[in-house]
Amino acid sequence: MSEVKRLAILWAPWRMKYIESPRRKTCIFCIGDDESKDKENLVVYRGSKSFIIMNRYPYNTGHLMIAPYRHVGDLTQLSDEELLDLMKNVNLSIKILRETFKPEGFNIGVNIGRVAGAGIEDHVHIHVVPRWAGDTNFMPTIAQVKVIPELLETTYNKLKEALSRLT
């Protein structure tokens, strides 16, 4: 007999707002020029050609993504200026996360195409995931659960404070 895996249920109060809200008809990375919605959209920083945004469903606390303003699905479609700004914002993300959470390492990556793991295929973005020794604890292994220790709003505020100290 095959074993049926059961989904663990955790209390995650920030998820209800997402679940009950109407689905976006636009790309989550096409943020436009309205900076008044940056906190709501978890935009941490706006560069000249790209921006830093928090992941609403993070692998770890502080999981950031860097995306170009232009809606393209592949790095090869970006200009040299856009590529340079993306990498500058990857570097800034690392600095912000070090200042805020003191991680011991980072995973930095791009998933291009569904088979490569891209959840959003048509707007390329780079993941910056802070890592600590032991952050892959027993919960995902035996309980199929990932524990994120603080609310996204708390993490957002910490990242913005660190950014203001760095810039």
What is each model feature region?
Residues 1-167:
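HIT superfamily nucleotide-processing domains
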